[in-house]
């Protein structure tokens, strides 16, 4: 009994000592910052992070070591945040959330000071101030009454600030929140999300405030992430909201320079670009009958490269462009060495991303015998001699015409063994990460709008696959207008691809709840469709194409996050089975939502004759359950609002904001430190704990065949494409890398029904 009493007294003294230490640490931090108002945040942290490894004593000790006598109050708060960041480890990952709360306190303090100085006392006051300062587009106040804006202000939930980790909140604060002309923050995180929601809901004629709330909720709960341009530019005067643009470069001097101008304008307003150079004549080709005088594609690569450097994306990042060339183009060998470190530097372009378009025939021949000859042609010469453009075909018809060209002695050929071409491709890929791969036959077979054109290439991140055609000048006339002489050009706009992206954060969503998923997908589809109406287009050709097709790119992030929190290992059949169901459910919900929007607002211009209208889309993918058959009938009668729906982008920066894993990739590491402008930032796998630690496996340690198999399963449910990264180590041989490329073709070429049977 005496022993029990002694132990009981010991526990009492221990708890008393712990309380004393907590009060001491609390007092030490408050004194160190010189700010009594921080006490509430610190007490919340003590309550929400009760583990002894998150004791404020550790924070106080680290903070004290950073403090210097001559620090300002702002510098002391920054030191406190830094202390929490540096306490973050894979054993104590929640310090990153504590750091985020302290960072948010610091941000809120600055915002309060800014608001008081500007006489801002309500959300409407803030919007009026931002509009008057030219930081907000005047269309928000023109579209909503003061009463509506104050009602919308009631939707804001500051508690959702706690969802952020430090990396996400820090990135959001530095790159996405609106700042004053003196670079001070003037907008909170929740105000940013509400401002975006107000903008996205503007086209709604009925229940508009309800849609504002729905858009705000899915954004602020981090259930979805909009593309970087939408996050950065929605609600602003220049509201360019689209990420991806693709141009078909014609084989003419005027056309090439027009494409360069298009790229410059897209980059100026924050868009990334894909450029198809497969129509441009090769080096040594003829020009106006003069033999051997064409400079080829590589000379133009230098201009594209310099444009990317000269015209950055609103000062936020360097211009970004992927340049595509067909694997049968005569300039391919030089093209494959654009970014390598050896060779003539005058033939290099280190700031662009080369990409190659492959027909199935190339990979089949590579699999059968690497010593076979592959023949390269000049596209202009084929057009001149044969009367057709080889790049305008795919599948069996392309193969027949390719062999026709091979056997035509009138055509000059550049012949190489497939082994030599593959060696160039893989060496460049291992050294530089490029060229990107675009399997054109697979893409065109799955194109639901093949009745209106062909897909030559993809965008910067290889997830967009839509009909393409060149912009052409029809005529140039000299006219008189109001007494002045003017030059009038008539231009055929072609199909200048533009796509509006957003991603479902799978790690934050109730994937098993079919009803909730349908509602959230439908909300996001509506938001993306509204982007088409609201967008500020950098060039008119993009606006024309976007309104014809109304294409969107609904994708996914947090893929590995979603698997880990469910205890599903990447290298498992359970992974494939689970994600097969998830993406089928997402696809069903997206198609149903687009069809309902078509009923409400009208179908896209080219719906008639599409695979959507004929039902071929559903038959090709083996969607034959009663639910799918009923949806196919509904789509055929109601129409589709959007020609293209699903596309999976890599989502690197927006995934950081949402505190989840990037795209559909495995995590790089469970924990690592990343250097950013002299600071070391912790990167922690989402929801890292004893339960998820062994579920997360580094991308470089993962068997890449599982990633390829998973991509094949997902592709059944995606009408466009997906960005797939392969993580290759120095231990890989070139043969092993080639086998992965061949495996990609195996898991995407068969019909979906064959895929399901053989999985």
List the predicted regions and their residue ranges:
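Function-dense linear segments that define catalytic or interfacial modules
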Residues: 178, 196-208, 216-242, 246-289, ...
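Alpha-helix capping and helix-loop boundary segments enriched in small/acidic/polar residues
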Residues: 29-33, 184-187, 206, 210, ...
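Internal maturation/activation junctions in enzymes
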Residues: 260, 520-543, 551, 569-651, ...
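Catalytic alpha/beta core of large soluble enzyme barrels
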Residues: 148-151, 162-170, 465, 528-533, ...
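Conserved small/polar residues in nucleotide/adenosyl-binding loops
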Residues: 2-3, 7-16, 747-754
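Conserved, charged catalytic cores of large soluble enzymes
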Residues: 114-203, 280, 289-303, 313-319, ...
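Core nucleic-acid recognition elements
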Residues: 17-35, 47-194, 210-216
């Amino acid at each position: 009994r005496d022993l029990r009493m002694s132990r009981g007294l010991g526990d009492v003294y221990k708890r008393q000592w712990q309380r004393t230490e907590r009060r001491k640490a609390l007092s030490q931090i408050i004194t160190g910052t010189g700010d009594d108002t921080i006490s509430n945040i610190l007490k919340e942290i003590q309550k929400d992070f009760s583990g002894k490894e998150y004791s404020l004593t550790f924070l106080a000790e680290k903070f004290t070591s950073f403090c210097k006598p001559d620090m300002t109050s702002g510098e002391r708060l920054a030191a406190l945040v830094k202390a929490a960041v540096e306490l973050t480890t894979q054993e104590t990952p929640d310090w990153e959330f504590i750091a985020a709360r302290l960072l948010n306190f610091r941000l809120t303090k600055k915002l309060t000071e800014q608001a008081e100085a500007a006489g801002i006392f309500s959300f409407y006051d803030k919007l009026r101030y931002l509009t008057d300062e030219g930081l907000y587009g005047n269309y928000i106040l023109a579209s909503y009454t003061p009463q509506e804006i104050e009602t919308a202000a009631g939707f804001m939930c500051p508690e959702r600030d706690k969802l952020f980790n430090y990396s996400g909140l820090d990135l959001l604060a530095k790159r996405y929140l609106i700042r004053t002309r003196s670079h001070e923050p003037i907008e909170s995180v929740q105000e940013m999300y509400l401002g975006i929601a107000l903008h996205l809901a503007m086209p709604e004629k009925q229940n508009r405030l309800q849609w504002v709330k729905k858009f705000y909720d899915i954004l602020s709960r981090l259930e979805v992430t909009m593309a970087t341009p939408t996050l950065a530019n929605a609600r602003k005067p220049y509201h360019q909201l689209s990420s991806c643009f693709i141009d078909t470069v014609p084989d003419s001097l005027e056309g090439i320079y027009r494409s360069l101008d298009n790229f410059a304008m897209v980059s100026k307003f924050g868009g990334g670009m894909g450029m198809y150079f497969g129509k441009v004549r090769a080096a040594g080709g003829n020009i106006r009958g003069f033999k051997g005088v064409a400079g080829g594609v590589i000379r133009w690569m230098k201009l594209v490269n310099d444009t990317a450097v000269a015209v950055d994306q609103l000062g936020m990042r360097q211009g970004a462009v992927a340049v595509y060339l067909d694997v049968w183009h005569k300039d391919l060998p030089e093209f494959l060495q654009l970014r390598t470190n050896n060779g003539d530097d005058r033939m290099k372009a280190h700031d662009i991303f080369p990409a190659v378009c492959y027909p199935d025939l190339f990979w089949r021949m590579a699999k059968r015998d690497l010593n076979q000859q592959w023949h390269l042609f000049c596209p202009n010469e084929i057009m001149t001699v044969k009367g057709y453009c080889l790049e305008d075909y795919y599948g069996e018809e392309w193969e027949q015409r390719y062999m026709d060209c091979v056997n035509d002695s009138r055509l000059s050929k550049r012949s190489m063994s497939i082994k030599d071409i593959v060696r160039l491709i893989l060496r460049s890929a291992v050294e530089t990460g490029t060229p990107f791969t675009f399997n054109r036959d697979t893409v065109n077979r799955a194109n639901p709008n093949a009745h209106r054109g062909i897909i030559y290439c993809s965008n910067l991140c290889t997830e967009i696959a839509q009909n393409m055609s060149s912009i052409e000048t029809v005529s140039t006339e000299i006219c008189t207008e109001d007494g002045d002489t003017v030059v009038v050009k008539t231009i055929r706009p072609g199909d200048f691809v533009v796509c509006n992206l957003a991603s479902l954060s799978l790690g934050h969503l109730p994937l098993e709840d079919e009803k909730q998923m349908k509602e959230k997908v439908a909300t996001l589809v509506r938001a993306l469709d509204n982007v088409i109406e609201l967008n500020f287009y950098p060039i008119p050709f993009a606006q024309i194409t976007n309104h014809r097709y109304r294409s969107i790119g609904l994708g996914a992030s947090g893929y590995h996050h979603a698997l880990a929190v469910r205890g599903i290992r990447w290298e498992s059949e359970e992974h494939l089975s689970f994600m097969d169901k998830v993406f089928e459910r997402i696809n069903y919900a997206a198609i149903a939502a687009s069809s309902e929007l078509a009923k409400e607002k009208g179908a896209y211009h080219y719906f008639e004759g599409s695979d959507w209208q004929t039902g071929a889309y559903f038959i090709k993918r083996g969607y034959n359950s009663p639910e799918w058959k009923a949806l196919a009938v509904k789509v055929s009668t109601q129409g589709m609002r959007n020609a293209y729906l699903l596309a999976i982008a890599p989502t690197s920066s927006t995934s950081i904001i949402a505190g989840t894993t990037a795209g559909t990739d495995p995590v790089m590491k469970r924990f690592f430190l990343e250097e950013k402008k002299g600071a070391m930032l912790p990167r922690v796998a989402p929801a890292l704990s004893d339960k998820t630690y062994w579920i997360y496996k580094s991308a470089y340690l993962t068997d890449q065949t599982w990633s390829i198999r998973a991509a094949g399963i997902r592709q059944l449910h995606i009408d466009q494409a997906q960005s797939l990264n392969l993580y290759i180590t120095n231990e890989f041989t070139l043969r092993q890398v080639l086998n992965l490329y061949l495996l990609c073709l195996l898991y995407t070429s068969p019909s979906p029904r064959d895929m399901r049977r053989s999985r």
